């Protein structure tokens, strides 16, 4: 039976939500009621699949905690008052921590002036952020297009590459196996997970995938495309594959790909949506090899965990195809004042506190601890790997990975799997994680593995 619209119901629901937003704390009955409401509304109005996923990785097989607020800079608090060390980082958005006061203050100050731009007059913060990114990014990257997410950033990069290379008769894109570049139609064509691709086939034509980290496979693909007249417009890569399971390529791989792109006249697009903004121990992961892309994609941590923002930064030569008609690719909310304020504050915090260097130091500490655990539990752990504060623990099978996430949840440490590699649990905490919290995370992982071994032996 069709349901009639109800203004009264919508008004009551929105008023109830606003009342909750105003409250700093909830009493016990309010917490219980909120839990019930959230689970019901996810089931009936968001997507029940999310509930089943949360049930599979949380303690006791329930639906898990209902997130209510940030705790400290590196923790989350649920409606029951339980505090979790955040080792997921919202899949890489909380590089400067939760509710970083510098970022929050910048957004609040801008909100008091002008939350959104007119679209017709020039907006100062977009100009200032573009100038800042031109100074911050490597090589000849100069012009920025702003959007709201990593997927949008990749879409813009693909369209920009097409606009630049189409007059040259180059239409093919090369991506890599295990890649994740987003789920909109263009970005999904570069993504390499059949689960996400098959329901939407056919995707955009002209995309090929080669094994990640295999430079000879890349050369062969470029050669074959040239021989068949399918000349390559661009190669798109993640410096480290995040959703693929935190897969690091062999040393020198990015440098070699850059040389191949130059040799074949292909653009190099680096997707640093997850690896950028200090995550791997450098401001951008490509800086570990001093590689300079033609187009760079950013998002996630660029907004400081406070505002959504993405950016596509390109050289003047490439970006100039948009000069004659800047409306060829635009978005209403891209580069809005609140998002730009958050991004400018985030960059300031990263540089002022030297967080990329901290990511390298604390990442080494955590990775050493995880590798020691891998040696102690070879029956459970296949490998620990990573760079900076982007790490992964790969288990011997999918079930053990899920059990580890559940046990860590019991230890009040939040972790999660990767979308393209179910055996792998990602460790991606804020770069602001303290040394003491790093030690607590390693202890929690040891307790989790010990409990899992007991369960296996008892079974």
UniProtKB/Swiss-Prot annotation:
Record field: catalytic activity: an alkane-alpha,omega-diamine + 2-oxoglutarate = an omega-aminoaldehyde + L-glutamate; putrescine + 2-oxoglutarate = 1-pyrroline + L-glutamate + H2O; cadaverine + 2-oxoglutarate = 5-aminopentanal + L-glutamate
Family membership noted in the UniProt record: Belongs to the class-III pyridoxal-phosphate-dependent aminotransferase family. Putrescine aminotransferase subfamily.
Statement: the UniProt record of this protein carries the keyword Repressor: no
Keywords assigned: Aminotransferase, Pyridoxal phosphate, Transferase
Record organism: Escherichia coli O1:K1 / APEC
Cofactor(s) this protein requires: pyridoxal 5'-phosphate
Biological role: Catalyzes the aminotransferase reaction from putrescine to 2-oxoglutarate, leading to glutamate and 4-aminobutanal, which spontaneously cyclizes to form 1-pyrroline. This is the first step in one of two pathways for putrescine degradation, where putrescine is converted into 4-aminobutanoate (gamma-aminobutyrate or GABA) via 4-aminobutanal. Also functions as a cadaverine transaminase in a a L-lysine degradation pathway to succinate that proceeds via cadaverine, glutarate and L-2-hydroxyglutarate.
Name recorded for this polypeptide: Putrescine aminotransferase
Binding site for pyridoxal 5'-phosphate: 150-151, 274, 332
EC number: 2.6.1.82, 2.6.1.29
Record InterPro entries: Aminotrans_3, Aminotrans_3_PPA_site, Class-III_PLP-dep_AT, Putrescine_aminotransferase, PyrdxlP-dep_Trfase, PyrdxlP-dep_Trfase_major, PyrdxlP-dep_Trfase_small
Single Gene Ontology BP annotation: L-lysine catabolic process
Gene this chain is encoded by: patA
């Amino acid at each position: 039976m069709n349901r009639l619209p109800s203004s009264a119901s919508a008004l009551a629901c929105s008023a109830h939500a606003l009342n909750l937003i105003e409250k700093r704390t909830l009493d016990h009955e309010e917490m219980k009621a909120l839990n019930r409401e959230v689970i019901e509304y996810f089931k009936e109005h968001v997507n029940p699949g999310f509930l089943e996923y949360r049930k599979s990785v949380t303690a006791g097989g329930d639906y898990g905690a209902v997130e209510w607020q940030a705790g400290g800079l590196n923790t989350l608090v649920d409606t029951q008052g339980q505090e979790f060390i955040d080792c997921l980082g919202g899949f890489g958005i909380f590089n400067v921590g939760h509710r970083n006061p510098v970022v929050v203050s910048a957004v609040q100050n801008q909100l008091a002036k002008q939350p959104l731009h007119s679209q017709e007059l020039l907006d100062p913060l977009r100009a200032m952020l573009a100038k800042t990114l031109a100074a911050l990014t490597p090589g000849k990257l100069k012009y920025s297009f702003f959007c709201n997410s990593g997927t949008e950033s990749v879409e813009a990069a693909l369209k920009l590459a097409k606009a630049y290379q189409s007059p040259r008769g180059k239409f093919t894109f090369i991506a890599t196996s295990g890649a994740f570049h987003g789920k909109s139609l263009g970005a999904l064509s570069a993504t390499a997970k059949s689960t996400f691709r098959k329901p939407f086939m056919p995707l955009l034509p002209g995309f090929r995938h080669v094994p990640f980290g295999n430079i000879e496979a890349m050369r062969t693909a470029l050669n074959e495309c040239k021989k068949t007249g399918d000349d390559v417009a661009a190669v798109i890569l993640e410096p480290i594959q995040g959703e693929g399971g935190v897969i690091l390529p062999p040393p020198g791989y990015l440098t070699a790909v850059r040389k191949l792109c130059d040799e074949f006249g292909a653009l190099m697009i680096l997707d640093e949506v997850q690896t950028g903004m200090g995550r791997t121990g450098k401001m951008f992961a490509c800086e570990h090899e001093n590689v300079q892309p033609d187009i760079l994609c950013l998002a996630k941590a660029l907004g400081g965990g406070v505002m959504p923002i993405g950016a596509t930064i390109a050289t003047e030569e490439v970006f100039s195809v948009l000069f004659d008609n800047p409306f060829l690719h635009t978005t209403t909310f891209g580069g809005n004042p609140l998002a730009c304020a958050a991004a400018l504050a985030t960059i300031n915090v990263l540089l002022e506190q030297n967080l990329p260097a901290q990511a390298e130091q604390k990442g080494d500490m955590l990775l050493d601890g995880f590798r020691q655990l891998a040696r102690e539990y070879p029956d459970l752990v296949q490998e620990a790997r990573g760079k900076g504060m982007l790490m992964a623990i790969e288990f011997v099978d999918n079930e053990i990975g899920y059990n580890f996430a559940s046990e860590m949840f019991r230890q009040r440490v939040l972790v999660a799997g990767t979308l393209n590699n179910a055996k792998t649990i990602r460790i991606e905490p804020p770069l602001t994680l303290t040394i003491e919290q790093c030690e607590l995370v390693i202890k929690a992982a040891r307790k989790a593995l010990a409990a899992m071994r007991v369960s296996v032996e008892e079974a």
